[in-house]
Amino acid sequence: MSLADELLADLEEAAEEEEGGSYGEEEEEPAIEDVQEETQLDLSGDSVKSIAKLWDSKMFAEIMMKIEEYISKQANVSEVMGPVEAAPEYRVIVDANNLTVEIENELNIIHKFIRDKYSKRFPELESLVPNALDYIRTVKELGNSLDKCKNNENLQQILTNATIMVVSVTASTTQGQQLSDEELERLEEACDMALELNASKHRIYEYVESRMSFIAPNLSIIIGASTAAKIMGVAGGLTNLSKMPACNIMLLGAQRKTLSGFSSTSVLPHTGYIYHSDIVQSLPPDLRRKAARLVAAKCTLAARVDSFHESTEGKVGYELKDEIERKFDKWQEPPPVKQVKPLPAPLDGQRKKRGGRRYRKMKERLGLTEIRKQANRMSFGEIEEDAYQEDLGFSLGHLGKSGSGRVRQTQVNEATKARISKTLQRTLQKQSVVYGGKSTIRDRSSGTASSVAFTPLQGLEIVNPQAAEKKVAEANQKYFSSMAEFLKVKGEKSGTMST
């Protein structure tokens, strides 16, 4: 029988064997079964050795002796050649890893034995110190004398100051009875056995951790030496582990059974050793399943590297672990802050001006005149002259009424007067100067002045109003003209110049 077959034969649960042996098949997860406790512990015995038999077993002594033997030897990486399962030390590592589980069960049995025996002396201590090892150390320290709770330095190394104060107050009012010397001796024996088993468990952990760095260095870096040894033992060796897909590696060590009478709500389906490893448990609960899938995928790669004895220094393992931690940090990052978009620039279109000097003058110029106001005004209760629509057109209102007795005169309003721009005024002024024209701007004459005159003799006579001015201008052009120049005249005979 090969070593892999022996490891498979050592598995306790047949369901785990099926799970470890099926790689590509996806079979439906069976319902959680109720199993009865196989052995009913008889705690009425006088000695703890009658119920806790692991300490005196031959298997425990052989494994611990081999562990001490291999610890004394210096491990060498070059000794690990070929399949890891063929290494002589590999079997010891797997057995030692399985032994830690049995030690945990044995410690629970001893704790229950001590609790039942010591409840005669101090029944309240069980509720004050819930931890099993702390309870065992406290019982060994107190013994039959509960006054040791006060000012005890050894007890301060076991319990916190607040717990010590509560224990001392409760011990002063307890209704417990004194233990006999024989009962106290049996309790001390049970306490010593529990503490020695706990020390052996830590010794096994140190050994497995030191040796897993040579057998599977990359896998140990990712999930730790203890978890790596557990999944290797369940899978049947490193070679079988390297052949398994990540979805099956994640389920190795899944608890699919529970004791009868206990609730199954706390049992997490599809969770194994990887889910309960430190690297996954360090995350919030809502990310642990996702993290377990990621770690299982990286463990598959690391196991394949270790099975071929590559990257013995763990370089690949450190790279995979860094990648896992980066993804963990990315998952736990807070969501990005929503970018506040600025408001778009408003459309500066032409807006209606509602004030200002220019606007007020424009309203005066384009506003309603008095005539238009009179035309728009109507009297209440009076019949209009055009009420029967005899004339086509708009009604004239008050403007069309007769007999008002007032003479309408055109009101000259500076605001409504026609305006000429300054540029046009300068242009007209230049034209009047050049062409000698006359205008109301140049001369203060009436704008109705005309060259047509009415005389009693001839009737209608056309008169040039500029004739007099023209005569004066012609006279001045001879001698007093501003345009006169010197003229050079050559004489016919003498050749003299005259002006």
Curated annotation (Swiss-Prot):
Pfam family name, one: Nop
Modified sites of kind Phosphoserine: S379, S395, S432, S439, S450
Record-marked site positions (Interaction with U4atac snRNA): R289
Segments for region (Disordered): 1-43, 334-357
Family: Belongs to the PRP31 family.
Purpose of the protein: Involved in pre-mRNA splicing as component of the spliceosome. Required for the assembly of the U4/U5/U6 tri-snRNP complex, one of the building blocks of the spliceosome.
Record remark on domains: Interacts with the snRNP via the Nop domain.
Protein name per its UniProtKB record: U4/U6 small nuclear ribonucleoprotein Prp31
